[in-house]
Every structure is written in structure tokens, then in C-alpha cells.
Amino acid sequence: MNEILCYRIFLGYNDSQTKEQLVTENELEQLVSAYFQKKKLGLGYISYLSDQSQDFLLKKKIQGENYLAKQYLNNPKRLCDNLAENLRFLHEQNFEDCPILDHSERYLKKVEKNASINNSNLDFVNNYNIRTTEEAYDYIENKKLLLRNDTLLHGDYCLPNIILDNWKFKGFIDLDCAGVGDRHIDLFWGAWTLNFNIGTDQYRDRFFDAYGRDRIDVDRLKLVGCCEVFG
């Protein structure tokens, strides 16, 4: 039997973000979560409730553990390969009826918003010889048309967000950034999470090799890194 989880989310608002906008974002997450459930890639939501100050999300719990379990962290090479294989599996899914088909446009809109208020973090471009936020923004302006909407994404492809049972894929969680967009967003986060959660960048090349170098565009990968400066 599937376990049910209740999440209480306290919402803070500012002049540029209304409660209606946040509700819409949560409703979109429900839609894409239901879509992932239909494709047997996750379990989705049961219910979303809201009042004037807080939101409640009822979720089904996928049985298993994420990649942060000792069983997986203690075997980083296998973890790396498995992470890449599960990403390739996701990216090969048909996406014609996905409720979010314009992820790249949404992604760039968020970048523009954060850039306009100087919300930035250069840690995301340590591998790309970008030294200032101005350089990052200029690269985005010159290359942003490279981003495509041709792949079903998780959008936050990190070790805590994939559930396994003894190395067997069980499902994805936390799908608020999912949709049809550019695969290099997931590739960027896959490499990032290996470095962040394992504590070394030595598995970066192995991850890309296991995914398939023939499907990786280094310019688009750098573009995503620059976008995440303002993510």
C-alpha cells in the first residue's frame, strides 16, 4: 500500500509575486506530477489545499530510498553510471501530451527576473571560465536561442529526487521544475549533484560518458550554467 505524506508549505509574498501566481505554480506541479504518474515515472499528488497563509500538499510516497542512502553513496562509480542511465531513460520518453511544453521559455523568464534584481551565484559556473555576473549574462544573451523544447525533463535532477529499490528505478519526486525543455538542464544538475553530494568533481566526465557524449552540446551545457547563476 502506498504511504501518504502531507507537506505544509508556508508562503511568503513580495510585491512581484501574488498568492494567485503561487497557487498556479502548485497547480502546474500537480498536473506534471499526474503526468509522470501516468507514464509510471512517479506517483503524483492526491490533493492540494490552500488558505490565506499556507498550502498543504498531500503526496503519495514512493517506496524505496533516494541516492543519498549509504547503499548507493558507498559505491559512487555505480551510482554515477546508474544516475546517467536513469536520466537517459527519462529523456527518451515520448512527451507529446505533457502539460508543460515550454519549459525553456519559463526558465529564461525566471533568469531575467532574477538578473533584474541582482540575485546571482557564480558558484554554478566554476567549470566554465566565467568570472563575473556580467560575463554570465552576456553569454546568455548571445546563446539563449540554443535552448530547445525537445526533451521531457525532471528540471532538478539531483540525488535526493530519484527513488530506487536496490538500484532499480522506482520513480521521481519533487517535480515542480519538470516539463518539456532542454536536456542540458538535467545534465547540468546531474553533474552538479555528484560533486555536491559525493564531495568531488571526479565523476563529472564519467557521468557524461555514461549518458552519451554524442547527445551533449558543450555550448548549451555552459549556457545552462550561466542561467543557473541567476536561477
Describe the role of every protein-language-model region:
Residues E25, E228-G231:
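Short hydrophobic/aromatic patches at helix-to-coil boundaries
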